[in-house]
């Protein structure tokens, strides 16, 4: 019996070793680590198990000789093992799909953030470009403003320079005028002391012949012939004729001297006319304070006084000239005819009784004094100096012409009839229609109440004037264009 026990143990151990499944079968599907107790527990009591269930447990390691117990999956059939593997793969696939969906949502969120960032970046770039363009435009405007400021400054500087130069020229001309007047006063005082004779009723020639006097020709051959050779006035006249003042190309002639004295002694305000006189005549440097100048003035005054002391025939002719010179002409005529002559005093009322000037406002009188009546000479536009050799008579001849003044032009313009219509029809039409436009617009926009009229009296009148504007303008222009009767000028013999 003792001998049979070891044999039975060996057979049981050998059978147990043969029936144990190999390790390769268990690891063929790689599911040994993924076994579950629930799946394996259902097959414990089944008869299909390849190996019988153990009836006892080994308590010692030496009982199984160091071999590990098998896993529960090794007791499943291959079909069951495939089903378990498919379940595990489905679960893993589901987890992978969930992860993929999560990642897709994250990618979508990132894309939306990226699109927002791109939009913000584009908007910022647009703002930056707009700011750059605005900065460039501002710089251009600043440059243009700087250029405008520079041009304005340059213009102001040029104007200031011109004004300063103008004031300097005015001061220079005033100084020249003062020196000229002073020299003339000195010459007159010297002449009064030398001659001791009384002055004429109008004073010196500079006072008797005003700036507004007309063309006057004084010829005195009889007086010059009756004078003695030793007369100081005749001698001074001869000295003046022989001096350098007789040459018209180099120095000032007698006519220029008398004309300058008459222009400067007329009592006019010192303004722009002084500047024009000085710039046109240039009397300052051409009038030296010398004995020749004094003799010339003495000779001229003596000639004028001698011509006033004789009875002469005066012929007046009407010519075109300024309207406000009649009074001055009358004074000049009275001063020359009845200034110092007691015999001619009876004829002065006769001169006053007749009209001193023409009725035509644009005409003046040419006075000719002499033994023989000569034809009236035309008025020139400026001073006409005459040489002694060109005049057949030995007497003096003076011509003074005053240019048109602004005050006289304004007076003539005031006398003209005023017209309330312009030259263009469109301007008058707009002037009549435009004030009625707001009323018409208000009438069109506002809601008209019941019983309220749709017209406005002013707009209605303007509409009527607009319709008849052409005829109104024609009638007014025709009434203004009617010529006013004006008497024609003629000649009179005194």
UniProtKB/Swiss-Prot annotation:
SUBUNIT field: Binds to STX1A. Interacts with DNM1; this interaction inhibits the binding of DNM1 to AMPH and DNM1-receptor-mediated endocytosis.
One cellular component term from this protein's GO annotations in UniProt: mitochondrion
Tissue: Brain specific. Found in synapses.
Compartments where found: Membrane; Synapse, Synaptosome
One family name in Pfam for this protein: Syntaphilin
Modified residues (Phosphothreonine): 214
InterPro entries: Syntaphilin/Syntabulin
Assigned keywords, A-Z: Coiled coil, Membrane, Phosphoprotein, Synapse, Synaptosome, Transmembrane, Transmembrane helix
Range of residues in the leader sequence: none
Ranges annotated as biased composition (Polar residues): 207-217
Any Gene Ontology biological process: neurotransmitter secretion
Positions of modified residues (Phosphoserine): 200, 204, 219
Gene: SNPH
Membrane topology label: Single-pass membrane protein
Annotated segments matching region Disordered: 1-75, 191-246, 338-398
Species name: Homo sapiens
GO molecular function: syntaxin-1 binding
Low complexity biased stretches: 7-49, 230-246
Protein name: Syntaphilin
Residue ranges of coiled coil: 79-161
Function description: Inhibits SNARE complex formation by absorbing free STX1A.
Biased composition annotated in UniProt, kind: Basic and acidic residues: 344-353
Keyword Hydrolase: no
